[in-house]
Amino acid sequence: ENVVGVLMPDGIQPDIDYSNGLVEFLGIRHYVFNIQGGTGGILDEMARLGMKPSRQTTVNLPSRMRMVTLYAIAQSEDAGIVLNTSNLSEDWVGYCTVYGDATGAFSPLGMYTTEEVIALGAELGLPEKFLIKPPSDGLTGLTDEDNLGFTYRAVNEYVRKGVVDPAVKE
């Protein structure tokens, strides 16, 4: 009763059914808030001013628009606050968008590696289909590991044991 899920596609999101399935499984109140108007409006205004957005702008803008949306919704809810979903593995390598997905009043998963987050979800009874989906920013069409150029397993080995994968070290 104290949790509100906010699904924020930027136009059409191919895996929105996954997100819908998760909020339905959790039984939480939720909104589907399409941020395309916000991101499109900013890009249109940049074009009007003769500005060409960089690749980083187009990749990070939806994440920042999502955070603006979350804060607008939270401030419109009774005692609403925004939590971020960053985890230790992402934080360790800086895999986030500043003032985007890394923003929130606190980070309940911030002390856990990706593997520990999956184990926590399993312990809490989440179905396997919600645990095995390859992490993706949902923006570039690539997995997190494709974007990073190394695996979360390699990050986690370093974070928890100080062991560096020789392939990553090169």
Residue ranges, per PLM feature:
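ATP-dependent adenylation/nucleotidyltransferase module used to activate substrates
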Residues: 1-93, 121
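Alpha-helix initiation and N-capping motif
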Residues: 35-39, 114, 152-155, 169
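Short, flexible coil/linker elements and helix-boundary hinge sites characteristic
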Residues: 50, 121, 131, 161-162
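Catalytic subdomain that performs nucleotidyl-dependent activation
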Residues: 58, 62, 80, 84-154
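Residue-level marker of positions within ordered structural domains that often coincide
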Residues: 75, 126, 163
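Short alpha-helical "packing" element that flanks the helix-turn-helix/winged-helix DNA-binding module
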Residues: 154-162
